[in-house]
């Protein structure tokens, strides 16, 4: 699958790849690589005006790469932020001989200054749309009541509740943020809404505070205060005080949460809620790369319960997760299981089946699109019917597989190909320039390559017979895919030294005489070479290191 192309992919030269050295290369290795390329590209070695001009351009590029990597400060900047970091304004005021950590802090300071100038243009919109569906007529149908009713052959599926909420943030200064939010809800024909305004201030690196004002048609004015504070590096506390004004008087509320990191992956929470639905809750949450585990216990009025849940995270490109939970309390028991999966770059689709007493069976479908959430709880039955559980489990899976294979996958493939084509059009001039530079480099290498081949032949050493770089098509590829490779035999032979060829872990597109023939797509390097008179062949991914000759590359000619 093609990889996404960043804006800097063409502009950001890989200096390590150009010099063909490791990212951990010593100053001696850098100097040796620089001298070798200087001997190859020095303008004074070429009499032809065109070759001389091409050699001068390549020589300057090699010199620039060496200047950056040979200076500890510029090398540290380049290693962390790339070529763009070197072009950042403000480095001229940075003192020499700073450590990489100090350089990182300086760069972040310069970035903050730029971000503050664009602060007013930022918002962080978040929204939720929830649509409750009553589909109990599918399973809890009483046929004797519908015998004399016209049109009773079709189940009645209704939307019985809806909820919409939205919020935006408006940074006022580097420490102050205004938040505006609103919500609308309706259930069985009765509805209401509210609007809230909050002002948040970051008081220090250890805490922040927030004032909130709200009003609604069903509830009176609301005044709230939220505080957050890091007590220690491993412990923090949050407090939320609220005053709800109504015709019955003032209803105060207080919620306090104390949290502590038990280890690097585990956090313990202790929550006390007073006022509306008073309760004491304790929970332990463990979150690792492969799983998310929660256990909680609540004692409260009117609801007390125990909860245990587990989520397994698959290490795949689609970030698939499966989860299950058990909740038991005074109001019943609920078992819930489900899964979620990333269906596009910004969208995650999930479904869960909830089985409870006395709640019955429900199917919950959720779609997260960027910062927007769409939630559809579908109530199937008030009873524990095996048929409802079966259809709630199998139905979404079948629908997802069908939609993903017939609609989503073709759509994403078409979008990706369209994006790649647009990128190729936008970068056509840059690619053409790099192609011309690569061809010029190959012409400048011809004389050196001739001498290298003569030396290798005299000792029965390493001869590059053929080498190709780019996108190769195999039997599993789609029919409309085309081979997009370039011949890199001469550039690779030029890198042979003492019957050895060593390429570092970096994109080969940055090597002298190479260029990217298929921007944004996966590439490989295939080499057919001869060593000690025996043919060898190897193929490696673009960013994988290569060292030849190797016995494992030998072509078996006995069969």
From Swiss-Prot:
Stored Pfam families? DnaJ, DnaJ-like_C11_C, DNAJC11_beta-barrel
> Which residue intervals define the domain J in the entry?
14-82
Among InterPro entries, the record links this protein to: DnaJ-like_C11_C, DnaJ_domain, DnaJ_domain_CS, DNAJC11-like_beta-barrel, J_dom_sf, Mito_inner_membrane_organizer
Q: What is the recorded membrane topology of this protein? A: Peripheral membrane protein
The protein's location, in the record's own words, is: Mitochondrion; Mitochondrion outer membrane
Tell me which PROSITE patterns the record gives. DNAJ_1, DNAJ_2
Q: Keywords in UniProt for this one?
A: Acetylation, Chaperone, Coiled coil, Membrane, Mitochondrion, Mitochondrion outer membrane, Phosphoprotein
Judging by the UniProt lineage, the source's domain of life is: Eukaryota
N-acetylalanine modification, residue list:
2
Coiled-coil region: 415-457
Which residues are modified to Phosphoserine?
Answer: 204
Gene Ontology cellular-component annotations: MICOS complex; mitochondrial inner membrane; mitochondrion; nuclear speck; SAM complex
Q: Tell me, what is an example of a GO biological process annotation in this record?
A: cristae formation
Q: What does this protein do?
A: Required for mitochondrial inner membrane organization. Seems to function through its association with the MICOS complex and the mitochondrial outer membrane sorting assembly machinery (SAM) complex.
- State the oligomer form and interacting partners: Associates with the mitochondrial contact site and cristae organizing system (MICOS) complex, composed of at least MICOS10/MIC10, CHCHD3/MIC19, CHCHD6/MIC25, APOOL/MIC27, IMMT/MIC60, APOO/MIC23/MIC26 and QIL1/MIC13. This complex was also known under the names MINOS or MitOS complex. The MICOS complex associates with mitochondrial outer membrane proteins SAMM50, MTX1 and MTX2 (together described as components of the mitochondrial outer membrane sorting assembly machinery (SAM) complex) and DNAJC11, mitochondrial inner membrane protein TMEM11 and with HSPA9.
Q: Which family does it belong to?
A: Belongs to the DNAJC11 family.
What extra comment accompanies this record? Following chemical mutagenesis predicted to give rise to a transcript subject to non-sense mediated deccay, mice exhibit an autosomal recessive neuromuscular disease and abnormal mitochondrial cristae morphology.
The protein, known as? DnaJ homolog subfamily C member 11
Species source reads: Mus musculus (Mouse)
């Amino acid at each position: 699958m093609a990889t996404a192309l960043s804006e800097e992919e063409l502009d950001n030269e890989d200096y390590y790849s150009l010099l063909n050295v490791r990212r951990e290369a010593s100053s001696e290795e850098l100097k040796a690589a620089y001298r070798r390329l200087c001997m190859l590209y020095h303008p004074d070695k070429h009499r032809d005006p065109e070759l001389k001009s091409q050699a001068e351009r390549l020589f300057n590029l090699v010199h620039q790469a060496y200047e950056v990597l040979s200076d500890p400060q510029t090398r540290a900047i380049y290693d962390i932020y790339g070529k763009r970091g070197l072009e950042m304004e403000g480095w001229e005021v940075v003192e020499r001989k700073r450590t990489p950590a100090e350089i990182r802090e300086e760069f972040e300071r310069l970035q903050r200054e730029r971000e503050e100038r664009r602060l007013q243009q930022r918002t962080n919109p978040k929204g939720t749309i929830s649509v409750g569906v009553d589909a109990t007529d599918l399973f809890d149908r009483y046929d004797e009541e519908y015998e004399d009713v016209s049109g009773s052959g079709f189940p009645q599926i209704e939307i019985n509740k809806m909820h919409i909420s939205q919020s935006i943030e408006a940074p006022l200064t580097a420490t102050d943020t205004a938040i505006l939010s609103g919500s609308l809800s309706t259930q069985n024909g009765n509805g209401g809404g509210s609007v809230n305004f909050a002002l948040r201030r970051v008081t220090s690196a250890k805490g922040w505070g927030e004032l909130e004002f709200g009003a609604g048609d069903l509830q009176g004015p609301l005044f709230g205060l939220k505080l957050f504070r890091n007590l220690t590096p491993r412990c923090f506390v949050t407090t939320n005080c609220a005053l709800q004004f109504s015709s019955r008087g003032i209803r105060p509320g207080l919620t306090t949460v104390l949290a502590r990191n038990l280890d690097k992956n585990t956090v313990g929470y202790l929550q006390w809620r007073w006022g509306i639905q008073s309760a004491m809750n304790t929970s332990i949450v463990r979150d690792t790369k492969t799983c998310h585990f929660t256990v909680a216990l609540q004692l409260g009025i009117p609801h007390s319960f125990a909860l245990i849940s587990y989520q397994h995270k698959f290490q795949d490109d689609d970030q698939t997760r499966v989860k299950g939970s058990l909740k038991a309390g005074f109001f019943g028991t609920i078992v819930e299981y489900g899964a979620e999966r990333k269906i596009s770059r910004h969208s995650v689709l999930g479904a869960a089946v909830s089985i409870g007493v006395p709640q019955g069976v429900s199917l919950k479908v959720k779609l997260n699109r960027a910062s927007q959430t769409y939630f559809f709880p579908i109530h199937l039955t008030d009873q524990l019917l095996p048929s409802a559980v079966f259809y709630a489990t199998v139905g979404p899976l079948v629908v997802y597989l069908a939609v993903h294979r017939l609609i989503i996958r073709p759509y994403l493939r078409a979008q990706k190909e369209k994006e790649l084509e647009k990128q190729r059009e936008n970068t056509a001039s840059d690619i053409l320039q790099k192609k011309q530079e690569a061809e010029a480099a190959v012409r400048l290498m011809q004389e050196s390559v001739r001498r290298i081949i003569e030396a290798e032949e005299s000792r029965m050493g390493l001869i590059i017979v053929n080498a190709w770089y780019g996108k190769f098509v195999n039997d599993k590829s789609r029919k409309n895919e085309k081979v997009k490779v370039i011949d890199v035999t001469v550039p690779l032979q030029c890198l042979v030294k003492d019957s050895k060829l060593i390429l570092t872990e970096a994109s080969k597109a940055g090597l002298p005489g190479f260029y990217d023939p298929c921007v944004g797509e996966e590439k490989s390097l295939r080499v057919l070479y001869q060593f000690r008179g025996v043919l060898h062949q190897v193929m490696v991914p673009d960013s994988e290191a290569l060292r030849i000759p190797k016995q494992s590359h030998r072509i078996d000619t006995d069969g």
